[in-house]
Regions:
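Short hydrophobic alpha-helices and adjacent helix-cap/hinge residues
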Residues: 1-330
């Protein structure tokens, strides 16, 4: 069931001292606190929320002090997003922070008047979120992590580790709107490397066992997990454990995957993207218009390698790859 975490309501007990408050101070207390709607297709994530709050803080907004936040999480059930978005519109929030690609598309369909700030791992122009990166137009702007664009690089890195393998696989969620773009990009990369690529699909946890059984049957050299995928991202620990259990070298976009025991991660900085969304939300609360705020591309890309997992898989990471790593987990 989708999660609702409502705005924090702070009640002050007014005693006799209230009569001595300056008139201006009392007037300030009566001004309604702006509300930001936080819409996400995944499960509650403290690190992402903290990054979003940091962005708000940069513009002078502190949750519970001068801004309230309505948290709506779909917990990987994308069909719940329309109802969650409609609820935020009904509440007339000041800004909607749509912090995943499915959430961004859903929010865009739900309102043309409430400002929307998104984060996505795909091309927001191709998704129809904005007219252009430099001039978004309308009520929508945000940040892109370029994770779709760097997915071919993940295949290159994996092949560099496994130069004798010629069969690889890509795991995607078929319900996500950018799966076709991702699959097309990686198929092109595989052809350029002379590799055979199989596309495997999972939209529920029940699909995972079949996916890894297929990988073993295909004798796949390694697995690339599709970037920018909220359902898969929220289950990075489970995927890391399955990859290790079935001895499948795997690479994904998020740092959390490598920290959870995955072999490698390579992708844009998710936390930086959430921070940008928070900062843009704050600027809009101060009066700026989404159409005047260009879509930001978070160009910071990180390669994380888990050497403990590599040893468990019997892999020796080439020194050239280790030298490029931003972080090595021993």
């Amino acid at each position: 069931m989708a999660s609702y975490i409502g705005r924090r309501k702070f009640l002050a007990t007014l005693g006799g001292a209230a009569a001595a408050w300056p008139l201006a101070a009392r007037a300030q207390q009566s001004v309604p606190m702006p509300v930001v709607g936080f819409l996400n297709g995944g499960s509650p994530d403290a690190n992402r929320v903290a990054a979003f709050r940091r962005g708000l803080n940069e513009t002078g907004y502190v949750e519970g002090h001068n801004v309230a936040i309505e948290y709506h999480w779909a917990e990987g059930q994308y069909d719940r997003l329309p109802a969650l978005a409609r609820d935020l519109v009904r509440r007339q929030v000041s800004v909607i922070a749509a912090t995943s690609t499915p959430a961004a598309i859903t929010a865009r369909a739900a309102t043309t008047t409430i400002p929307i700030v998104f984060t996505t791992s795909s091309d927001p122009v191709e998704l129809g979120l904005v007219a252009s990166l430099s001039r978004p137009s309308g009520n929508v702007t945000g940040a892109t992590q370029l994770n779709i664009e760097v997915t071919p690089k993940r295949l290159e890195i994996l092949h560099e580790l496994l130069p004798t393998a010629n069969v690889f696989a890509l795991l995607v969620n078929p319900t996500n709107p950018y799966t076709e773009i991702l699959s097309r990009n990686l198929q092109a990369a595989a052809r350029s490397l002379g590799l055979q690529l199989h596309i495997l699909q999972a939209s529920t946890e029940h699909d995972f066992d079949a996916v890894f059984a297929t990988l073993v049957k295909l004798r796949s050299g390694g697995l690339v997990i599709g970037g920018g995928e909220v359902f898969l991202d929220s289950r990075h620990g489970q995927l890391a454990a399955l990859a290790l259990r079935h001895a499948v070298p795997t690479i994904y976009q998020g740092r959390d995957f490598a920290l959870a025991g995955g072999l490698m991660s390579y992708g844009g900085s998710t936390m930086d993207s959430y921070r940008v969304v928070g900062a843009y939300a704050g600027r809009i609360l101060k009066g700026e218009k989404p159409a005047d705020l260009p879509v930001q591309q978070t160009t910071k890309v990180e390669l994380i390698i888990n050497l403990k997992t590599a040893r468990a898989l019997g892999l020796e990471i080439p020194p050239t790859v280790i030298a490029r790593a931003d972080e090595v987990i021993e």
